[in-house]
Amino acid sequence: MNFSKSLLLIAFGGTIGSIFRYLLQYWFGNVLGYSLPWGTLTANLLGSFLIGVVYAISDRFPLFDPQWKFLLASGFCGGFTTFSTFSYETFQMLKSGHYILFLGYICLSVVGGIGFAFAGVWMIKNF
């Protein structure tokens, strides 16, 4: 595949993913408030699930066009999920003395992200 085309697919997917993450964070911030960064957590968990689905589909169906992986996995999921925001939010919790929230958020994010990725793979392999 053409390198320039790959970059364009990643850029387009990343743009859409970033917009979706912003909308999700905006919605959660207005509905649930900011006691826990629900938008970031939800984006990271859903993105982990989706990347599991994309890679499982590409493994299961050899004719799956690799361009979709660039668009969906590297692009959309890369823009939708955010390790840097997660890191900043956990630092703010620690700095504010919210130690239990800090530990809970780390556990939910890391274990949940891995679990959601496995769930995405499992779903494709079993259906």
From Swiss-Prot:
GO MF annotation list: fluoride channel activity; fluoride transmembrane transporter activity; metal ion binding
Pfam families: CRCB
Compartments it resides in: Cell inner membrane
Keywords: Cell inner membrane, Cell membrane, Ion channel, Ion transport, Membrane, Metal-binding, Sodium, Transmembrane, Transmembrane helix, Transport
Regulation of activity: Na(+) is not transported, but it plays an essential structural role and its presence is essential for fluoride channel function.
InterPro entries listed in its UniProt record: FluC
Catalytic activity: fluoride(in) = fluoride(out)
Name of the protein in question: Fluoride-specific ion channel FluC
Gene name as annotated: fluC
